[in-house]
Amino acid sequence: MENPRRVQILRAIVEDYVHSREPVGSKALVERHRLPVSSATVRNDMAALEEAGLIVAPHTSSGRIPTDRGYRVFVDQIAALQPLTGAQRRAIQVFLEGAHDLDDVMERTVRLLAQLTHQAAVIQYPVRAGITVRHVELVDVGAGTVLVILIPTSGRVAQRAVELAEPLDEVQLLELRARVLARVLGSTLETVPGRVAGLAEELPEALRHAGDRVSEALAVLAAASDEHRLVMAGTANLARFSGDFPQSISPVLEALEEQVTMLRLLSAMQQDERGVAVRIGSEECDDPLAEASVVATGYGPHAASKVGVVGPTRMDYPTTMAAVRAVARYLSRNLGD
């Protein structure tokens, strides 16, 4: 939009509506924002904004509210994000540094982001490119069952119980573990299935069945795709905004619960020069999140995984964008340590 005054008026309408949830009239705009023009001039500009599809009159109200297109213009006009306060930054750092493993980091991150933004927060587990095998442990749990434990450099421990035709004694178990480690230690997770293939044929007869079962378990554990997992927090926050979803909040909650929709959307979102991506309402597609907005950004190596929030289109975009970006940066730093 090239008209500076209309941009200013649109910005004021968005800010007032987000704050009050009440349609905004020309007189209120002039008084509240001390605009150096008359109410009649503002009404003319509002008529032009409405004709452009940026604001709309709900029902018979004399005031106007932003449309999805109006929010988009508003968001695109945000030149720089306001940094968080020193207290907020310290709180994020302390909160995340208290985590003891990857699962705890993920849980803490979404809880923190939900608290900061008062929206529903989501985080995608880190993509595993470059993650290698740190250790493999085999534990005899009795009754011919062995617990196969895979410990990758990402810190997320995975385990799987396998039943053996014959139990192994301690010496056999140690030998099998040594053979397995010789194959996979330091290997990337993607290569583990190929590295354990054929292992059983190289083992002594007494270990072949166990070697085959352990190899199968390791292949499954290594192939388990953490990047297709989401952690969520703050969905109860959406209930406070149920009136902001014209049809029903149910499709939004179902999309969050189903995860597939969220993962597909997050993977398609590309952050801009400000370091965030914003999807507003139905501007791109008609899906279960067509009445919601999503603010997300990448974190970790190459910003390949996403973290963000979901809320109504009537959202405090500048504050939300700044919070999402800040949390992602601290998260990247935490995981890189």
From Swiss-Prot:
Disulfide bonds: none annotated. Keywords: Repressor, Stress response, Transcription, Transcription regulation. It comes from the Bacteria. Pfam families: HrcA (PF01628). GO terms for biological process: negative regulation of DNA-templated transcription. The keyword Zinc-finger does not apply. SUPFAM superfamilies: GAF domain-like, Winged helix' DNA-binding domain. GO terms for molecular function: DNA binding. The keyword Transcription applies. HAMAP family: HrcA. Negative regulator of class I heat shock genes (grpE-dnaK-dnaJ and groELS operons). Prevents heat-shock induction of these operons. Belongs to the HrcA family. This is Heat-inducible transcription repressor HrcA. The lineage of its organism: Bacteria, Bacillati, Actinomycetota, Actinomycetes, Micrococcales. The gene is hrcA.
